[in-house]
């Protein structure tokens, strides 16, 4: 018989994972609250990258259904930079990133927050642009407003996603249903872990022309 994971057990496991994660400098500064499998993180961290690391660590704990990341980024004095310096570094980082249409992406910086705008053909290009700037010193957050242009018909998108799900060793494809509306993909069905749910979403995003994925897959633990 499977052991029932209570919210108290889940909170302890998340706290233990945060303490174990080397990318988190001060785990004691992070508050963890759990209700019905939903984890809320509060408190502060020293960088945007650390904020994302904490979120990923919490999501990786068995039994976690979702994470609300309310962590505040408080930059130490040594990491504080002007918006002009951040913009210069961000522009250079984008210049060095392979596979993205650099001339189609614009950026702005306000109080340490980097905003990305423009158009790309593939979702991975949108992600790559964000990955290029989010770890830069002084960055408090990234607002990714880059749009993915639809490139193929919805029937082709659905077919490609169905085939990709079947190829994935991590998933039971027969448990997942794919619906397409224009360039939007809706995923339904059941999986046994958050990682499987995220993997199905990742697969869907790989299809050309996808601009939105609504992941309604239910995690059954």
Predicted regions and their residues:
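N-terminal targeting leaders
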Residues: 1-221
């Amino acid at each position: 018989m499977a052991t029932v994971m209570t919210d108290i057990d889940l909170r302890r496991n998340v706290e233990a994972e945060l303490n174990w994660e080397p990318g988190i400098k001060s785990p004691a500064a992070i508050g963890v609250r759990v209700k019905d499998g939903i984890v809320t993180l509060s408190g502060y961290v020293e960088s945007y990258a650390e904020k994302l690391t904490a979120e990923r660590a919490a999501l990786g704990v068995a039994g976690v259904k979702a994470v609300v990341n309310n962590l505040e980024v408080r930059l130490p004095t040594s990491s504080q930079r002007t918006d002009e310096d951040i913009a210069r570094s961000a522009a250079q980082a984008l210049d060095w990133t392979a596979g993205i249409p650099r001339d189609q992406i614009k950026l702005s910086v306000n109080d340490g927050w980097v905003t990305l705008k423009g158009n790309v053909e593939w979702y991975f290009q949108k992600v790559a642009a964000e990955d290029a700037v989010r770890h830069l010193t002084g960055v408090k957050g990234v607002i990714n407003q880059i749009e993915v242009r639809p490139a193929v018909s919805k029937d082709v998108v659905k077919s490609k996603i169905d085939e990709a799900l079947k190829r994935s060793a991590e998933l039971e494809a027969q448990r997942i249903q794919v619906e397409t509306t224009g360039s939007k993909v809706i995923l339904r069905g059941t999986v046994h872990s958050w990682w499987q749910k995220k993997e199905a979403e990742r697969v869907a995003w790989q299809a050309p022309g996808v601009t939105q994925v609504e992941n309604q897959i239910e995690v059954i633990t």
